[in-house]
Amino acid sequence: MIKTATVAMFGLLLVATGASARHRRSSDAEPGVFDYYLLSLSWSPAFCLSDPGAAECNGPRRFGFIVHGLWPQNESGWPENCNVHQPVPDTVVSGISDIMPARGLVYHEWSAHGTCSGLGVADYFALVRSAYGRINIPASLSGPQQAVEQPPAAILAAFMRANPKLSPASTVVSCSGQGAPRLREVHICLDRSLNPRNCSADAARGQCRAASLIVPPIR
């Protein structure tokens, strides 16, 4: 289902915002037993507006979409915090930092979700990179230099043009904020071979219902 300072706080804030949109959580989950994956792409400029002191918001690189996580999902509910105890090596953290730029986020995603994948640490984050690499970011969202207001359907359409195998049933645009909501994340449902598939009803509930949203620029 759909989830959502210091480097560590990056992961905690994303988890807090995402979890509010999720529903039934599985307990006592067995690693590797799940139905599909959800790739969560977070729009970093929106995060940086809410937490400008975060490390990834003040470095030399400005990010657009980053990977929030690759989450094992079930048709109803989702596994989390499986009983796997394997530390994340520094080499894995540095190796994935171009798409997951916060150490705390990497640690959290492994502990909460990677442990339920049935994979080891290195293989899980290799799968994260592979999933991200299969998605083409629309040109209009690759480096916008000014804020754009548009309906969520326009963002969905842009992703489908850039990725013809995606559909409205496999892709969810989420937003957050009062008044004029901001683009928060794009969630893409993938089968266990990383091919697009329909999202479950729980995952689809995260769809932004606003008439329009703001896409903050990359600065």
Feature locations, PLM:
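Bacterial N-terminal signal peptides that target proteins for export
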Residues: 1-7
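Generic detector of solvent-exposed, compositionally biased contiguous segments
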Residues: 5, 22-26, 154-159
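Bacterial N-terminal signal peptides
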Residues: 8-14
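N-terminal signal peptide c-region/cleavage motif recognized by signal peptidases
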Residues: 16-18
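N-terminal module-boundary/linker segments of secreted carbohydrate-active enzymes
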Residues: 22-48
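Domain-level detector of nuclease and nuclease-like folds
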Residues: 38-40, 51-219
